[in-house]
Amino acid sequence: MRLIAVGRMKDRVERDLFQRYAERLSPRLDLVEVAEGRGAPAEIKRREGQALLSALPDRAFAVALDEGGRAHDSLAFARVLERWLGLSRPVCFLVGGAEGLDGPVLARADDTLSLGPMTWPHMLIRGLLAEQLYRARAIASGHPYHRAGRPA
């Protein structure tokens, strides 16, 4: 799996959060960072969108993280992720910058994902996504990490 995201993680806490889960995942979650755009907001969005699409492998199954994307509870997301991983295509998650994802990125996406209706900092999303991917894989494998729904 691959996370293709706009900008470089400079904050150690954000980087450590991402790495804590990304390194424990199987398949591993690799991070590809593309440059932040410059200029007016529309130009930034366009440039960042082009950079995201350029970093996306040709046959990839692209999942765009977007506030208008599909929201899942943890069990449903585990099922969806297993389906994506079974496609025999590289699964790539796309995270835009502060201006969001450009239209062509959303058009190229095979699916969309929302981590809820709140707006999250795009650097923090990396760690949140890595944790949710780890949780989904734990659910699928029967690992005790996910505790929701267990009897008290």
Curated annotation (Swiss-Prot):
Q: List ligand-binding residues for S-adenosyl-L-methionine.
A: L65, G96, L115, G116, P117, M118, T119, W120
| The keyword Methyltransferase is assigned to this record | yes
A Gene Ontology MF term for this entry?
A: rRNA (pseudouridine-N3-)-methyltransferase activity
Q: Which Pfam family would be a valid example here?
A: SPOUT_MTase
Which chemical reaction does it catalyze?
pseudouridine(1915) in 23S rRNA + S-adenosyl-L-methionine = N(3)-methylpseudouridine(1915) in 23S rRNA + S-adenosyl-L-homocysteine + H(+)
InterPro entries per the UniProt record, alphabetical: Alpha/beta_knot_MTases, RlmH-like, tRNA_m1G_MTases_N
Tell me, in one coarse class, where this protein mainly resides: cytoplasm
Q: What class of enzyme is it?
A: transferase
Location of this chain's protein in the cell: Cytoplasm
Give the top-rank taxon of the lineage listed in the UniProt record for this protein: Bacteria
Documented EC number(s): 2.1.1.177
Q: What does the entry list under GO cellular component?
A: cytoplasm
Write the record's keywords in alphabetical order, separated by commas: Cytoplasm, Methyltransferase, rRNA processing, S-adenosyl-L-methionine, Transferase
Q: Which HAMAP family match?
A: 23SrRNA_methyltr_H
The family assignment reads: Belongs to the RNA methyltransferase RlmH family.
Function recorded in the entry: Specifically methylates the pseudouridine at position 1915 (m3Psi1915) in 23S rRNA.
Any idea what this protein is called?
Ribosomal RNA large subunit methyltransferase H
Organism, as annotated:
Gluconacetobacter diazotrophicus (strain ATCC 49037 / DSM 5601 / CCUG 37298 / CIP 103539 / LMG 7603 / PAl5)
**Gene that encodes it:** rlmH
